[in-house]
Every structure is written in C-alpha cells, then in structure tokens.
Amino acid sequence: MSDLWKTKEVSSQCQCFPLVIVQGFLGRAESRIWGDFERHLNHDCHGLVFDSVGPVSSLHDRACELYYSLVGGTVDYGEEHSAAHGHSRYGRTHAQGLYPQWSLENPIHLLGHSLGGPTIVKLQYLMKQGHFGPRAHPDWIRSINTISSPFRGSQAVYTLGERVDAAPEVRPFSMGAMLSKVIHTISYFSPILPKAFDFHTESRRMSFLDISIPSLLNRMWKSDWAESYDAAPYDVTFESADQREANQEGQPHPRTFYRSCATYLTEKVEGNENFHTITSSNLLSFPFSPPLYFLARVMGSFDFSKIQPVPSFLDEIKVPDDVEQGLLTGDHRKSLPEEYWANDGVVPLFSQWHPASCSSIHCQHAETMSPTPGIWYVEQWNNTSHMSLVPLWVASDCQKQYWLNLGRWLRAIELQN
C-alpha cells in the first residue's frame, strides 16, 4: 500500500452522495461495531447508511433485500428464482426505505466487506437485467467499493465443510455442518430473539411460527438451506463463481466507478513448493484469532486439483491437457501464480481483485487520483488480515489510512459530475 493519496488533496467543492455499507457472511453493518471511522472518511460530507441483509443468504437474495431496504416496499426475490429454489417469492416489508429518493438524480456509493462485495455486484447485475422493473437503473450506483471480497470464490468454504467433489453438499460433522444446525436453531426462535440474531429467513419459513419441532429436526439432519444452490456457502465456491462469470456478472458498467482493496498476510515458505503461511511477525502484529491462523495455513497449501468441476482459472495456466489433473501437485504446482495461495485468512488474493480474470475485464492494478468509470481499480494491502480494516474499529493506522483514502477517492469521483 503506497502513500499516493497523501501527495495531493482533493477539492471539497463537490456534491456528496451517501455511502451505503453492506456487511459479509454472518456480519452486521452498524455504527456501534464499525466505530468512529467517519471523521477519517469525509469530515461530515457523506451521509452513511448501514444496511442489513441476510447474513447467510445467497447473493441473489441478499441483493434483493438490499434493494428493497433502500427504496422501501416488500422484498421480491422474483417468481422464477423463488420457484427454482423452493422458497417464498416475497420477504419482509420495509414501510420506509433507508434511502427512498434513490434515483438517477440521487445515486449512491456502495461499500461491501467480504461477501458484501459480490452482493453489491449482484445488485447492479440484477438492475441491468431489469429484475426490479424498468425504473431501476445501474446508473443509480455511482461507485462500488470492496474490501477483502471473494469475487471468484475461496478455498476456505471447502476447508469448512463444502464437498470439493459435490458442492453444495456438506461433509457430516464438519464446521459447516455444525454451523448450519446453529443457524436453523436460531432462526427457529428468531421471533423472540434480539435483532442481532436476525437472519432474514422469512421466505424460507424457518421459525416456530411456520414449522414444527419435528420439521426443525429434519432440517437439522439435512439442511435444505445449507445444502442448496441458493445459500451463501455455495456462492463462495469456485463453481458458483464460474457460473457468475459465464453470465458476465461483474463486468464494469461504463458510468460506475470501481475500487477493490485486496488484503493478504501470508508469505511464501522456503523451498520449491508454492506454499504460503503466516509469518511470526504477522502473528504478533494483529489481534489474530486461531481460526484465521488455521484457515490461512490450510488455504496456503490447498490442492486445487481436487475440486470438481475443475475451476475455470486453471484454464488460464498454459499447460498441456494431459497434465491438467496433476497441475497442482508435484512439479506442476509451481505453474500456478502465488496469488492463488496468498490470502488474508479467509479469501485468496486473486479472488479479491475483481470478478473474472484480468484478461476478460478492464482493470488497473494501481492507485490513481484521477479515476475513470468502467475500470476496476485494484490496490493490495500486505500484512493485512480479513478483519484488519473492518468491521471492528480499533483505530489502527491502517484503518485510518483506508478511510482517508476512500474519502479522497469518493470526492475525486464526485468532482467529475
């Protein structure tokens, strides 16, 4: 991470649009968690909107919930989508939207952490497709900004329980299987639990108001949520990411600005193999949890050749077809670049850059003080974990620097109106 933004101040004479914050998997976007970052962002220029979407829901469902929470009304997941995935078409009703004036004249900036990034990309894609009707337009989104987002999937989901050969099936007794049981239990009692335990599961009828205890036990035995194609875990698989890329999701819109912050804290170990691990200095530098340490090590030595179907990014490696299955073992392991193993404890570096490969998207892996719409700008932060910048505010130097940079970036965009 360079100090490019420190070299030039951007004029404050601009029209400020609100910044909508979208959290990731199992996260909550609210000011008491994200903390006192606003004074570093904009000196009271940009209004902030903390949005709430299903913390375990699929990207499609989260995008729909995001849209209707902003404009108001009853969440409509779409007739075709809901029928295909076996849940109700309509979700909760928002009597008052968080930003009901959202329009071409009143666009917004969006910031997504982790799964919040692909959620925002899915929202713009659905707007392009006319999912929300003819009035909604992708130009309503002035900029998309992301932090540590798994655009192209993550090997972490397989480590936690997703089957490498039969996703979205989950391995019994894995962390993912245990987590699904906890989510079903919390959702069952959600009508009487605090708001912090709100999983937005109305359309799936998972509470005691809709199902019996025997039905709950059946779902805990084999989850129709966790082992479906319409859930957050599956959307983080490489297979799901490939499907989104095939549909051209995430291709930059010509009048929207894009910026991603890619984080990593691992380094290549000594030797010929392309293994990555966390250094002792990084362990001392972060309030680092054992789960992130474990995931970072496993992700840094992951064998991609076990995944079926074979991820599309292997096609980007120029090797003969007859060695593809052995590409990531033995001598062929060195053929895959380091960014596939470098990670922040949750997401590999290459997946955080942007949707799709660099060869199929207009991107620039460098900072700029003169952003151009339709280009995906990527900046990389080393020695930075998945949780270093957001959501928990600890007033670290890297957190302050990120928000200062983001504020200058947004003002540079708004000066172009």
Question: Where are the regions that the model predicts?
Answer:
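Lipid deacylating catalytic domains
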Residues: M1-L111, L115-N417
